[in-house]
Amino acid sequence: IVSEKYNTNHQSVIVPTNLNFDYVNSIINLMDEPYADPSIIPSFIISNEISKHYKVAISGDGGDELLGGYERTKLSLSKSSKFENYLSKLYKFYPSYFGTGSKFLSKSSELQVKYSSFLEDNNFLKLLKINPQNTDSYININNELDDYKSLILADYQFFLPDMMMYKVDRMSMANSLEVRSPFVDHKLIEYVLSHNSTYRKDNENKLLLKNYLLEDFNKDFVYRKKQGFVFDLESWIYKNLDYFYDYLLSSTKLKEFDLSSLNLLKINKSRINSQRIWKLYVLEKFI
């Protein structure tokens, strides 16, 4: 739709389902530290493809952070619903089935605790018999602003530079590509923060951007479901489950951890548990 309107050359890049392990390991090593976000793989692939034609590219990084586009922002600000109360009760009996956001489900009323819980997986640490450290203090929530703007600033100060921009910089520079994002322009940030947070209606995020886009595109396109920049990690992990299982159990680097619960991750197949297997795999590469 965008390509047709602006008469641009649109190309799609498909992440293969049969990723080679040597190829994946080479991408993991580019981070120089255990970085468990699997989106490094599509980030590397698309950077590699763009670099064949251009040396500078524009990205949308910072848009979700600036405009509250993440689900954790909505959930951190929301008041308890019947569904959330149900999840909280379920969490009491089956805590290991929940990943990030568990403190939200355990009914904490503190904004900082709610928000930081979406950036950690303490239940996974407990499965490994590791005592979780309190990470709430790592996130600085500005109490002088309203809750919505406080979360936006927290994302900009912590999540965006240390996670998203870091990843994009590593993956793009590995392909001799420079990536720039208009959403980190300080004038745009000041403009968005100058608006009253009441423009965020009925838990609808990105209203400023959506209203702007409605001038050129139809509502179905502007309000389409959010699409994350990820690949099907769950299918890939479970397709190669025996390899991961044998590899992790035989690793001498992980001997300090209690891997007896690895059987639980293997048996209880889920998106969250596939991510946990991936985290262990990445961690092993840097120990």
Language model region names:
Residues L151, D155, F159, M163, ...:
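Generic recognition of short, well-ordered alpha-helical interface segments
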Residues F217-S270:
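PAPS-dependent sulfotransferase catalytic core
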Residues Q133-D147, L193, L254-R271:
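Short amphipathic alpha-helical segments and their helix-coil junctions
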Residues A36, N142-D155, N203, L264-L280:
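Structural motif
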Residues S43-S47, R224, G228-F231, L283:
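N-terminal glutamine amidotransferase
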Residues Y156-R170, V192, V282-I287:
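Short Ser/Thr-interspersed hydrophobic loop/turn segments at strand-loop and sheet-helix junctions
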Residues I1-Q133, R170-D216:
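ATP-dependent adenylate-handling active sites, centered on carboxylate activation for C-N bond formation
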Residues T17-N20, V24, K149, L153, ...:
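Generic alpha-helical segment signature
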